[in-house]
């Protein structure tokens, strides 16, 4: 039995979900831990309550609903498009508030019209929040990971650096640190004598020699390749580490990256600003901007008020599975996030779906909504 009570508005919230043409689903509280550890991001991973089955399987208390709902969709072989709604407890170590709390939300799976589906879920979130908080001014912050990825690719960064920057998207301190590293790369020697020695021997440019050298060293020091990474895996990681550290981004490209990340303006003005930025920087990011433009147009077509919406180029959310739109909603003048979500087009494939399933959704923090409703009275 839950240790906390459902908010009094839970029934009305579920009725709102039904009006939005969703199918309510539930998922087990005890979940396999691996999907969350692999795909949920560092911020969520360190907050998960872990346990273990009698057979040694790593399990956890459900820390969120998106991954369980997607797994359920795959397991039941349900066709798409499909819109799921959920409401239930999640368990997460938090700095403020209880570690057991209620979340609700919608996962919109399988609609090939990306812009329309993105606009629909933002509209869904605003609809249910407006009904719970009729006297409050809601503010929406939007970002777009696909535009960010297009910009860093157009700047000519190596694939390894692109992965690091994408992983840091939404964490301004981490992005600043990585950009500082790109402005001042390290020499191979900073990684220690072993790396300096193989660099001096020219092995970093000859993978087979490097693999053989690592294998001989492992054998001589008693390391088992069965109990650790293979010599080839270690060689590839070593070369990537040195290559990343030695990469320098020229001043012009760094200025372009920083100019992009500084964009922060009303959503209605964002398409023109992004096209102007891309033109001045001579970046070929047409596909990403075309989708961005289509989403803004779809929001207008759906009747969404652009006034409360703001685009921040550096805005992301601390979950690794997002691929495009990301957004959060809060009451004007307060920091508490009431709703957050985005697009996660790769997630279902990574979880085992046999075909590509585009997906977008959002979650609501019911305890925070209840607190906001209490302030309103």
UniProtKB/Swiss-Prot annotation:
**Corresponding gene?**
hisZ
Tell me a GO cellular component. Answer: cytoplasm
**Purpose:** Required for the first step of histidine biosynthesis. May allow the feedback regulation of ATP phosphoribosyltransferase activity by histidine.
Assembly and binders: Heteromultimer composed of HisG and HisZ subunits.
Q: Which UniProt keywords apply?
A: Amino-acid biosynthesis, Cytoplasm, Histidine biosynthesis
Q: Name one GO biological process term.
A: L-histidine biosynthetic process
Q: What is the lineage of its organism?
A: Bacteria, Pseudomonadati, Pseudomonadota, Alphaproteobacteria, Hyphomicrobiales
**Know the name of this protein?**
ATP phosphoribosyltransferase regulatory subunit
Among the GO molecular function terms of this UniProt record, one is: histidine-tRNA ligase activity
Report the InterPro entries cross-referenced here: aa-tRNA-synth_II/BPL/LPL, HisRS-like_core, HisRS/HisZ, HisZ
Question: Where is this chain's protein located in or outside the cell?
Answer: Cytoplasm
An additional note in the Swiss-Prot or TrEMBL entry is: This function is generally fulfilled by the C-terminal part of HisG, which is missing in some bacteria such as this one.
């Amino acid at each position: 039995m839950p240790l906390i009570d459902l908010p009094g508005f839970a029934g009305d919230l579920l009725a709102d979900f039904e009006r939005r043409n969703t199918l309510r689903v539930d998922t087990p509280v005890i979940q396999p831990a691996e999907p969350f550890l692999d795909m949920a991001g560092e911020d969520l991973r360190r907050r998960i309550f872990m346990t273990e089955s009698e057979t040694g399987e790593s399990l956890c208390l459900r820390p969120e609903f998106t991954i369980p709902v997607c797994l359920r969709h795959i397991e039941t072989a349900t066709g798409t498009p499909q819109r799921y709604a959920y409401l239930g407890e999640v368990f997460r170590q938090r700095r403020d508030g209880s570690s057991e709390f209620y979340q609700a939300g919608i996962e919109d799976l399988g609609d090939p019209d990306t812009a329309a589906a993105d606009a629909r879920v933002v509209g869904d979130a605003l609809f249910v929040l407006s009904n719970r908080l009729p006297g409050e001014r809601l503010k929406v912050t939007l970002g777009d990971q696909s535009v960010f990825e297009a910009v860093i690719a157009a700047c000519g960064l190596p694939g390894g650096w692109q992965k690091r920057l994408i992983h840091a998207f939404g964490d301004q301190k981490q992005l600043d640190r990585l950009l500082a590293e790109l402005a001042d790369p390290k020499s191979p020697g900073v990684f220690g004598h072993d790396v300096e020695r193989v660099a001096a021997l020219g092995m970093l440019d000859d993978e087979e020699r490097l693999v053989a050298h690592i294998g001989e060293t492992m054998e001589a020091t008693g390391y088992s390749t069965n109990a650790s990474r293979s010599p080839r895996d270690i060689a590839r990681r070593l070369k990537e580490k040195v290559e990343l550290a030695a990469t320098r981004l020229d001043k012009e490209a760094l200025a372009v990256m920083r100019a992009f990340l500084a964009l922060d303006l009303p959503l209605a003005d964002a398409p023109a600003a992004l096209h102007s930025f891309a033109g001045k920087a001579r970046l070929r990011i047409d596909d990403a901007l075309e989708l961005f433009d289509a989403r803004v147009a779809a929001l207008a077509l759906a009747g969404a008020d652009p006034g409360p919406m703001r685009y921040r180029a550096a805005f992301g959310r601390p979950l690794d599975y997002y691929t495009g739109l990301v957004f959060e909603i809060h009451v004007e003048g307060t920091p508490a996030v009431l709703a957050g979500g985005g697009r996660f087009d790769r997630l279902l494939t990574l979880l085992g779906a046999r075909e590509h399933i585009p997906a977008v959704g959002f979650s609501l923090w019911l305890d925070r909504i209840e607190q906001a409703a209490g302030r309103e009275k």
